[in-house]
Amino acid sequence: MSFIPNTEAEALSALFSRRSVLGATAAGGLLATPLAAFAQSGAASGPGEAEITVDQARQEPIPIVVPNFGAGLGEQISGVITSDLNGTGLFKVMSGSVPPGSTPDFSALKAQGARAAVAGQAVGAGSVRVEMRLWDVLSGQQLQGTAYTASNSNWRRIAHIIADVIYERMLGEKGYFDTRIAYIARTGPRHHQITRLALMDQDGANERMLTGGEWLTLTPRFNPVRDQIAFMSYANNRPRVYLFDLASGRQQILGEFAGISFAPRFSPTGGSVVLSATRGGGSDIFVVDLASRAKRQITNSNGAIDTSPCFSPDGSQIVFNSDRGGSPQLYIMSASGGAAKRISYGSGQYGSPVWSPRGDLIAFTRIGSGGFSLGVMNPDGTGERILTQGFTVDGATFCPNGRVLAFCRQSASGAGGAGFASGIGTIDITGFNERPIRISTGASDPAWSPRNG
């Protein structure tokens, strides 16, 4: 019996002979221009005195003043910045007035308890120019000064970019707000759902349906270097992996396999895809080169089910799920093939592994004691920690800096799970700050994009 993500299990269980376990910045028309620091305050070359260590689970959030950037659009921009920063649990956004064209009153800001402050304004009609300055209240230094110009329709992206700048200057590593999440939008009753490939901003805004819902669609995965998504579709009643080009809207079959192909993930270079394909009574893992479409088999399951492969960030290894030892567990092997080493030894059944972009953790789903758990472990299998639990928690995906996971949470209430619901939430790698992403449909199978270029 093999463990695959819950949505894959629903689709594939009827096809397998044995039932699966359920389970700064210039792009996109946006221009960034540096703003000089005021003469009395030199620009700092690194994070200010408010720098903290993000790995500390209960670190006190940084108090930061983010005023309105003006009426109308300016107020909306500051609202998104505030939501982004507060959502991390690492910042405490405070109201206040910081004049955009002069040095802040640091004494007043210190008395308010602020450690950092933002000054900004948004002006324009058909296009918007947003100026922002970030100040370290404790040192009196300007940490950042930038002006952004874009069409009015891009105002949310400006806000996310400003939040990323604040995050990076205060914490010393890049933020993840100017990103997107691909997912499966779900509508209709539980056993007759319409599934669509969909895309949204990481905060749930700008929902966009990419496919029409004619066929069952599952497991989207972002290419790390281009606007391309791999996913599984039952188009024409043949379950196969497809590639979707976001710029053109075109989709194409990744490759022909004798059986079902599923569970795709891109290599770190974006030049190949690792996936599972059925063979006889089991499934094996293959790597498909995108340029030549050549296929290379890297496992020989001998009737077991090897699935859910994921590359390490350097592309040298693959973590995957297999029932070759009798129960679904996690294994690591060289990306070129060879022997596999088991890394999961806790109680229960393991699946849905995904490697952190930092290389330090592997996230997973574990089934045991009558429920689902979402956790992380070191790549050698040590240091296992459970982050959250529930009726079903599955499909973890890391944000680009590796500090936050998005995942699918399914719930059931009433007799027979009559109140079944599926949605996407986020949680940080310390196990704190779990938050739902509010969108207009049911949702599953999240896949976090790289940073927008």
UniProtKB/Swiss-Prot annotation:
InterPro entries registered for this protein in UniProt: 6-blade_b-propeller_TolB-like, PD40, TAT_signal, Tol-Pal_TolB, TolB_N
Signal peptide: 1-39
S-S bridge residues: none
Record's subcellular location: Periplasm
PROSITE patterns, sorted: TAT
Keyword annotations of the record: Cell cycle, Cell division, Periplasm, Signal
Any one of the GO BP annotations: cell division
Keyword Cell cycle part of the UniProt annotation: yes
A GO term from the CC aspect: periplasmic space
SUPFAM superfamilies (UniProt xref): TolB, N-terminal domain, Tricorn protease N-terminal domain
Assembly with partners or alone: The Tol-Pal system is composed of five core proteins: the inner membrane proteins TolA, TolQ and TolR, the periplasmic protein TolB and the outer membrane protein Pal. They form a network linking the inner and outer membranes and the peptidoglycan layer.
NCBIfam families: propeller_TolB
Function (record text): Part of the Tol-Pal system, which plays a role in outer membrane invagination during cell division and is important for maintaining outer membrane integrity.
Family, per entry: Belongs to the TolB family.
Protein name, UniProt field: Tol-Pal system protein TolB
Species name: Gluconobacter oxydans (strain 621H)
Organism lineage string: Bacteria, Pseudomonadati, Pseudomonadota, Alphaproteobacteria, Acetobacterales
Gene: tolB
